[in-house]
């Protein structure tokens, strides 16, 4: 599976450092980047990721996070509200429809749940899988 590079919440955009990393990173691996500071969510970063077939991790830690596809595969991460709480079935069904469209376009989709403070992650992952296959 892919390797996730998660940046700290208050580490602002540094395209030079990202470029250095991407040039040094083995291209045989799938790299996903979870940016938690909104300054990273810009066209320069998206283009850089795309040139290296690295995925922008689409997550729910930043309000209105863009669903920008930067690779020939997709990386989704569901954190929940402060890493807890269960996702509502309607939300998971909507996510499943979006995932189905990506799969239909020939993309691999990786979806991870991190809302495990009360143990909901496994149940939510099973629900999402059922909705995608259903």
Q: Which residues does each predicted region cover?
A:
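Residues lining hydrophobic/aromatic ligand-binding pockets adjacent to catalytic sites
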Residues: 1-134
